[in-house]
Regions:
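Active-site His/Glu-centered metal-binding helix of metallohydrolases
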Residues: 99, 103, 107
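Hydrophobic alpha-helical transmembrane segments
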Residues: 1-95, 108-217
Length: 217
């Protein structure tokens, strides 16, 4: 049981992927032009391994934003969610949750080829993730007591309006806890997608490479 649970939880992988983007971004900030271009290219490639959006033209702020969104969302998908279902249903529960989450990641984006599979996978993931997502958002808000109120306001005023409520709550909590802005428009398959800005407080700043390290549990 312990071995199966270990493989359903992706904390180590999540940390490694986050650092793979953060490290070259931080080096790019203090490098000469040629070296900076090289490091930004490394960061864009590392980011492309963990997100579905286009990364070729991403700025450092956009890369930091996308990475933190992925880390916060996957804290729910790969850590808290499996643990909750392991407590409730044991190993089968943890495996079921991760399977639903993986299928949603593979098929959940609405394309003609996978539309039917995608709708079923996304719906199952939404149902199974209802409780874990809300628990994760509360834990994230509590992770930084200084910004607890900001995190809760972000959850209530922006997270619930995200196109995927479970993901929105978790990312909004992360934005508030770090006092940064997440969300905003992003490009998928060459098409710009309008997305809500997450983070309620007026003094919230754009995400930076250093915030990636802060977002890793």
């Amino acid at each position: 049981s312990a071995a199966v649970l270990y493989f359903t939880i992706g904390q180590k992988s999540l940390k490694q992927h986050g650092q793979a983007v953060a490290t070259p971004l931080q080096k790019a900030a203090v490098s000469s032009n040629d070296r900076k271009h090289e490091k930004l290219t490394q960061a864009r490639y590392a980011l492309s391994m963990i997100v579905s959006r286009d990364t070729q033209q991403s700025t450092p702020d956009q890369m930091a934003t996308a990475t933190i969104e992925t880390i916060t969302e996957n804290t729910h998908d790969a850590i808290i969610g499996p643990l909750v279902f392991f407590v409730l249903l044991g190993v089968p529960g943890a495996v079921l949750f991760r399977l639903a989450n993986t299928l949603d990641a593979m098929w959940g984006y609405r394309t003609p080829r996978y539309e039917l599979f995608g709708k079923c996978a996304a719906r199952m993931d939404d149902i199974l993730g209802y409780v874990p997502a809300r628990l994760t958002s509360i834990l994230m808000a509590l992770s930084n007591p200084v910004n607890f109120t900001k995190a809760m306001k972000s959850i209530l005023f922006t997270g619930r309006r995200w196109y995927s409520t479970n993901a929105g709550l978790v990312m909004a909590a992360g934005a508030g806890a770090l006092n940064i802005r997440l969300g905003g428009d992003a490009i998928y398959n060459g098409i710009s997608k309008k997305r809500l800005m997450l983070g309620h407080d007026e003094d919230a700043e754009s995400a930076q490479a250093s915030d990636i390290q802060r977002s890793i549990w």
